[in-house]
A protein has these predicted regions:
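The feature captures the beta-strand-to-loop junction immediately N-terminal to the Walker
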Residues: 38-40
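ABC ATPase nucleotide-binding domain helices that frame the ATP-binding cleft
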Residues: 46-49, 145
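Helix-to-loop junction immediately C-terminal to a conserved catalytic motif
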Residues: 53
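Conserved ABC transporter NBD signature motif
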Residues: 61-69
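ABC ATPase nucleotide-binding domains
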Residues: 75-81, 85, 89-235
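Non-catalytic connector elements of ABC transporters
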Residues: 240, 250-372
Length: 372
């Protein structure tokens, strides 16, 4: 892998009058990496992508591709290609003409265009379809044609702006796997923009979680999921039960708290140096919570109690149980075990639950930013 990153942003900022859309963002993407920028609507991720593509000029900072600044390079001269959410295929052209459009604009001769188009269509699994109309393709095939149209130009970086957003759920799940396989096949750096955490977690080598114009955390999918560095990342990446609490005592990283609803909890300081008396936000994943018909089994875990079943959200392997803690009234979302042991639970049943302190992450509070 090359020591010079394919893409590097150095303190990139973008202001729209008094509004700061992107605030001094710095990162680098090594060659051949699937890099995702994940965040909610309005966080600045599309603005950042448009600056990389050259459609918008940064207010400050520098942007380098293969070690060379491209701030003064127009979009059509940058070694990047872009796949949009709605693909922008030309309906009046056949598939081959769509894929070869960029090569024609570059003045490549017809023989070479035909060879390169056939080669790239083979690589995306669409060999022999060059003469077919675009309208004859399925949604997934159109997606591959859009990627082929970009990859035939051999860009250093491929930018993808929520390209799966217009697809139905089943096809979207399939295309997540296909996109990752295509990226590996071409060994090209992908920079992928999405608000869908599942897309980012499944496909990416590295993920940057963006919020209010800054990167909250940059890391692997596992790091973001199991070791979120901020309360925003803990709440945005994956599902979590969230509580507001006050710290009772701290011993190293071990934190004992009382929630606003009066429930005692033990957890782990997420590296923010919380102290006695601090207000904190507490997170625990639904799959970290264990169920039992015997309170003695969960009573030794460190956190938990007895809860009344309020609802059962059946979703196959992703089914969840909604409990109301009998002591505090707090709501708990708990992933249903796949053993089938608790599938007979019904609304109104009481069941014991618990989880270990190591599964509880504690962050300095930003009260007013959550609904609990």
């Amino acid at each position: 892998m090359s020591q010079i990153p394919d893409l590097e942003c150095r303190a990139i900022s973008k202001n729209f009058d008094d509004f700061k859309a992107v605030k001094e963002v710095s990162f680098s993407v090594p060659q051949g990496t699937f890099f995702s920028i994940l965040g909610p609507s309005g966080c600045g991720k599309t603005t950042l992508l448009r600056m990389i593509a050259g459609f918008q000029k940064p207010t400050s900072g520098d942007l380098l591709i293969k070690g060379n600044s491209v701030l003064e390079v127009p979009p059509n001269k940058r070694p990047v290609s872009m796949v949009f959410q709605h693909l922008a295929l030309f309906p009046m052209m056949n598939i081959g003409a769509n894929v070869g459009f960029g090569l024609r604009q570059r003045g490549v001769n017809k023989t070479d265009i035909k060879q390169q188009v056939e080669r790239v269509l083979e690589r995306v699994g669409l060999g022999g379809v060059a003469d077919r109309p675009v309208a004859s393709l399925s949604g997934g095939q159109k997606q591959r044609v859009a990627i082929a149209r970009c990859m035939v130009l051999e860009p250093d970086v491929l930018l993808l702006d929520e390209p799966l957003g217009a697809l139905d759920l089943k096809l979207r799940e399939h295309m997540k796997i296909e996109l990752k396989q295509l990226q590996s096949e071409f060994n090209t750096t992908f920079v992928y923009i999405t608000h869908d955490q599942s897309e980012a977690l499944v496909m990416s080598d590295q993920i940057a979680v963006m919020n209010h114009g800054v990167f909250e955390q940059l890391g692997t999918a596992k790091e973001l999921y199991y070791e979120p560095s901020t309360a925003f990342v803990a709440g945005f990446v994956g599902e979590a039960n969230r509580f507001a609490a006050t710290v009772e005592s701290v011993n190293g990283t071990d934190v004992q708290m009382i929630t606003d609803q009066g429930k005692a909890l033990r957890g782990v300081d997420a590296g923010q140096g919380v102290q006695r008396g601090d207000t904190v936000d507490v997170f625990v994943r639904p799959e970290a919570v264990r169920l039992s018909r015997d309170a003695a089994q969960t009573g030794q875990l460190g956190n938990g109690g007895a809860g009344k079943v309020e609802n059962i959200l059946f979703n196959g392997a992703n089914s969840q149980l909604i409990l109301r803690d009998q002591a505090s009234g707090a709501q708990m979302n708990i992933a249903m075990p796949q053993t089938g042991e608790f599938r007979d639970l019904t609304q109104g049943d009481v069941v014991a639950y618990g989880w270990e302190p190591q599964q509880t992450r504690v962050y300095s509070s930003a009260r007013g930013q959550h609904g609990l």
